[in-house]
From Swiss-Prot:
Subcellular location: Nucleus
Protein name: Helix-loop-helix protein delilah
Its biological purpose: Probably plays an important role in the differentiation of epidermal cells into the tendon cells that form the attachment sites for all muscles.
Gene: tx
Membrane-spanning residues: none
Length: 384
């Protein structure tokens, strides 16, 4: 019975319990809705959260689309102040700066003018108070004293007896002051001039080597610049003197005097040329003048002109050839030629194509004379 009753009771209880649970759930829902408990709110929030998540995803996508559009705007805002800095200042700022500079210049000129006017006003007019205080006069005081001094000078011009002594002292003082100011200005100018300081060359180990190398280079350059003098043989000097057509002694005398006078005022290179010319002339003397033949100087007799001229033409035509005449000046040689041979118009009109043999061949006419002027091998020497 117990089991049956229990079962029946259980069945009854189950039904009742089902009904009771349904009623309880409804009550709980009502109370939950009335009280607003957390469970119901959570469910609502979850629903709202799901909706919000979708909306936030949509918003994120929309923001991603808008970000590349917004970034250049921010960059342009950042670049804007830099561009404004590089721009030129506005016109008002430029005008203000120029006006300030103009005002400074004007005030500087005014101050300079008042300072000059203070120096022009003598101390006697300023009075003892200003001299004792040693203070700088104000601009108004300076103007008043200057006006007073100007009126005194005008009155003295009109009336010479008007405070002549006082004005004389003022003028003397101003003159002394001007002299003092000039001296001070000169001293200031000397002080302002920069004095060049001579820097001592720094002594290094390789300085001596460098200086020696530089001196060697300079000496080599100077040696290259000095012209080399070609050696002149005795034959060339004989030919040069023989073409002139003067006796050896007179040519030697004239050339030696010209070479001495020329060497005193010429360069070392020309002195060497004159020495070479003298050596050639001495060789010519040895050829033309023989110690055993004392009659060779008979060419200096008055009949020497007939020796040079035969049948109205000169036996020794002027020929120079292409040999250089070192150490000889044209004026001296030409003078000696004109004195010895008056029939020639110009002793330097030599033919350029004439050979030395043509000049020497004219000496064959001198064979009839008693003295031996030329040696037998003399023409061969010129031909070699």
């Amino acid at each position: 019975m117990k089991s049956n009753t229990y079962e029946l009771h259980n069945y009854a209880d189950l039904n009742d319990m089902a009904r009771a649970t349904d009623s309880k759930d409804s009550r709980k829902r009502k109370t939950a809705s009335a009280r607003g408990e957390k469970y119901s709110l959570r469910q609502k929030r979850q629903k709202r959260g799901s909706n919000e998540d979708g909306e936030s995803a949509n918003l994120a996508d929309f923001q991603l689309e808008l970000d590349p559009i917004a970034e250049p705007a921010s960059k342009s805002r950042k670049n804007a102040p830099t561009k404004s800095k590089t721009k030129a200042p506005p016109l008002s700022k430029y005008r203000r700066k120029t006006a300030n500079a103009r005002e400074r210049t004007r005030m500087r000129e005014i101050n300079t003018a008042f300072e000059t006017l203070r120096h022009c006003v003598p101390e006697a007019i300023k009075g003892e108070d200003a001299a004792n205080t040693n203070e700088k006069l104000t601009k108004i005081t300076t103007l008043r004293l200057a006006m007073k001094y100007i009126t005194m000078l005008t009155d003295s011009i009109r009336d010479p007896s008007y405070e002549s002594e006082f004005i004389g002292e003022c003028l003397e003082e101003s003159a002394n002051r001007e002299a003092r100011v000039d001296l001070e200005a000169n001293e200031e100018a000397e002080v302002e001039l920069p004095v060049p300081v001579a820097k001592k060359p720094a002594k290094t180990k390789g300085s001596g080597k460098k200086s020696s190398a530089a001196s060697k280079r300079q000496s080599q350059k100077q040696a290259k610049i000095v012209p080399q003098i070609p050696p002149i043989s005795s034959g060339e000097s004989c030919y040069a003197t023989s073409s002139i057509g003067s006796p050896a002694s007179s040519a030697y005398a004239s050339l030696s005097s010209s070479s001495n006078s020329h060497s005193s005022s010429s360069s070392p290179g020309l002195e060497l040329d004159s020495l070479v010319g003298l050596n050639g002339i001495s060789a010519l003397d040895s050829l033309l003048l023989d110690t055993s033949d004392g009659d060779s100087l008979s060419c200096l007799s008055p009949g020497y002109g007939s020796l040079l001229t035969g049948s109205g033409e000169s036996l020794l035509p002027g020929c120079r050839g292409d040999l250089p005449m070192s150490g000889l000046e044209k004026s001296d040689v030409e003078l000696s030629l004109r004195l010895l041979d008056q029939s020639s118009k110009d002793s330097f009109d030599f033919a350029s194509d004439q050979q030395p043999s043509a000049c020497i061949s004219s000496f064959s006419a001198l064979d009839g004379y008693p003295f031996d002027l030329l040696h037998s091998d003399f023409p061969d020497m010129f031909l070699t």
